[in-house]
Curated annotation (Swiss-Prot):
Protein's recorded name: Glutamate-1-semialdehyde 2,1-aminomutase
Family: Belongs to the class-III pyridoxal-phosphate-dependent aminotransferase family. HemL subfamily.
GO biological process: protoporphyrinogen IX biosynthetic process
Organism name: Pyrobaculum aerophilum (strain ATCC 51768 / DSM 7523 / JCM 9630 / CIP 104966 / NBRC 100827 / IM2)
Places the protein is found: Cytoplasm
Name of encoding gene: hemL
């Protein structure tokens, strides 16, 4: 069995924890992907994980494939400056004017780690504020959780992180303006930066209160600290201008990833010119990497940006998410399930609970076991939902009307089967 072989060479049998699918007997094994579909050891599945949001045009999109093939013909790594990466950065800046200068790295984790380092270098301060339920990668600065109280110095969420490092991060409830302002006052002149997912997409889908985001902007400016928008998920997913364009808020620094790499490894951190000019080689904030601005990732990302600039992929993906969100709400309601559905652009998630979902606490109060059971049942009916209520479902430009109808029919059967199982 492949999973047994995998467990003999990988911790837990996988190379990222989210792939473990612990509620199933074994993880899904991918064989191929095309358009809206995954081909796996469990058959052909309509994919709503979409590589946790990295794919927006659809799997193996022909124009992305062509761009990558053309790059491979010319070589795949030079460790030198290329014209393509300059054009790529110029396009990003055109759509996100706050990103005046940027550094292209390889992962979202690298991007947030480097953005925080740049903020500390610029402000000459050491403490950062992050928010409960926001995920910013797997580095020591941000793998922390709140202790007891509304705003607390961080506690490591992973073994191997020194307490002294975690104490440089203060964790505050998401969407809570009063708690945030209190934390800013308590940290005082040690506050280097506030990092936030402007739309929380790593604890389910939590839509921000716009006044909350405005308060982050106002208070960081007042405190002389930097505001970092982590748009690894939302950047070029919710629109060409990202969440910052959607809400009209200009952060000091931004991190990007996922969509802008076209399915290849990428991360970007960038923002105000005077901050980014502190990054090596023009300044003392160190960042370097053999694979930075990898030509294949740049080629794929450039192809994706050109497609997105037509607007058509957004129209299809957003319409699909809207129809699916309404469809889930309808079928769940008809069958007597208490379900809350949240959607933004081509992102959606649903929760088995009464009332709204505005905070991480609301997500925790949802019936996670019910979601996991539905996920398992939906696989039998040919639909791969995102594997946890703490993740987000994504649509793409490949999720046209026929795919959506196929999905809704399968989900109706899945909810009916769930109803029979719970009696």
């Amino acid at each position: 069995m492949l999973f047994e072989r995998a467990k003999s060479v990988f911790p837990g049998g996988v190379n990222s924890p989210a792939r473990a699918l612990k509620h199933l007997p074994s993880p899904l094994v991918a064989k191929a992907a095309s358009g809206a579909y995954l081909y796996t050891d469990r058959g052909k599945l309509v994919d709503y994980c979409m590589a946790f949001g990295a794919i927006i045009l659809g799997h193996a999109h022909p124009r992305v494939k062509k761009a990558v093939e053309e790059q491979l013909e010319k070589g795949w790594i030079y460790a030198l400056l290329t014209e393509q990466e300059v054009e790529f950065a110029e396009r990003i800046r055109r759509h996100m004017p706050s990103v005046e200068k940027m550094r292209i790295v390889n992962t979202g984790t690298e991007a947030t780690m480097s953005a925080i380092r740049a903020a500390r270098g610029y402000t000459k301060r050491d403490v950062i504020i992050k928010f409960e339920g926001n995920f910013h990668g797997s580095h020591d600065y941000v793998l922390v959780k709140a202790g007891s109280g509304a705003a607390t110095w961080g506690i490591p969420t992973s073994a191997g992180i020194p307490q002294e490092v975690a104490r440089l991060t203060v964790v505050v409830p998401y969407n809570d303006i009063d708690a945030f302002i209190k934390a800013v006052r308590e940290v005082g002149d040690r506050l280097a930066a506030v990092i936030v997912e402007p739309v929380a997409g790593n604890y389910g889908l939590i839509i921000p209160d716009v006044e909350f985001l405005k308060a982050l902007r106002e208070e960081t400016q007042r405190a002389g600290a930097l505001l970092i928008f982590d748009e690894v998920i939302t950047g070029f997913r919710v629109g060409l201008g990202g969440a910052q364009g959607l809400f009209g808020i200009r952060p000091d620094l931004t991190t990007l990833g996922k969509v802008v790499g076209g399915g290849f490894p990428i991360g970007i951190f960038g923002g105000r010119g005077e901050v980014m000019d502190l990054v090596a080689p023009s300044g003392p904030v160190y960042n370097a990497g053999t694979y930075n601005a990898h030509p294949v990732s740049i080629a794929a990302g450039l192809a994706v940006l050109k497609e997105l600039e037509t607007g058509e992929p957004y129209r299809i993906a957003n319409e699909a998410a809207e129809r699916l969100a309404k469809g889930v709400e309808d079928v769940a309601g008809r069958l007597g399930f208490d379900v809350v559905v949240k959607r933004m652009a081509s992102m959606f998630q649903f929760y088995f609970k009464k009332g709204d979902v505005k905070t991480p606490q609301d997500v925790r109060e949802s019936n996670e076991k019910m979601y996991l059971k539905l996920h398992e049942i939906a696989l039998k009916h040919g639909v791969y939902l995102t594997p946890s209520q703490y993740e987000v479902n994504f649509t793409s430009a490949a999720h046209g009307r026929e795919v959506v109808e196929e999905t809704l029919a399968a989900l109706e059967k899945s909810f009916q089967e769930l109803q029979r199982e719970i009696g």
